[in-house]
Amino acid sequence: MRSNTEPNTPTTLAGLVLLSGLLGALVSGAALGEPIEKKGTTPYVTHFIFRPLMSMEIAGLGTATNLEAVGTTQNKKGEKMLDKMSAHCAALSVASGDKKYIDGACVLTDSDGDKIFSTFDTREVDKSQPDMSCGTHIITGGTGKYAGITGTEPFACNSLPALAGEGGYTSMDIPHNTSWEIKK
């Protein structure tokens, strides 16, 4: 006959399962920390590496290049919003005569897997922010905690030194001044 003090009794095992579930819930709640604000203005920078995927060129007329950009974000105020997110963008770079622009779309993903989607255009510049003279992102939506998010993100383009190796990879820091609102 077993005593109730043995570690493999049904009562002890059930207690351990309940305790581990309770501890998991407490740790998860603590890890989530403060909730995300519903509205705000956030300065952040994305550290990007650009990879050319395909290019068309007609000498003397112009080029069009498909680019993939990957990187991470850093909130400049040390806040949770738009900090430590992975960034993945698809872009089209066009240069023809006096026209030079890059259009595209980006997805920012946080550690929970929640996403923010935006489009961008380097021809749309917010003249009220002269330091952000490279273009503007338009936040069109999100998933999870970012569901219902909209906003604008004027941005600058700060080129970094050339990357080593082949493939035409380039890098850039892109600071943003983001005004956003989550309407759920």
Residue spans of the language-model regions?
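Bacterial N-terminal signal peptides that target proteins for export
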Residues: 2-17
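Hydrophobic transmembrane signal anchors and adjacent membrane-proximal interface regions, especially
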Residues: 17-18, 180
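Residues at structural and domain junctions
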Residues: 18-19, 99
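Beta-strand-enriched cores of mature, soluble protein domains
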Residues: 32-184
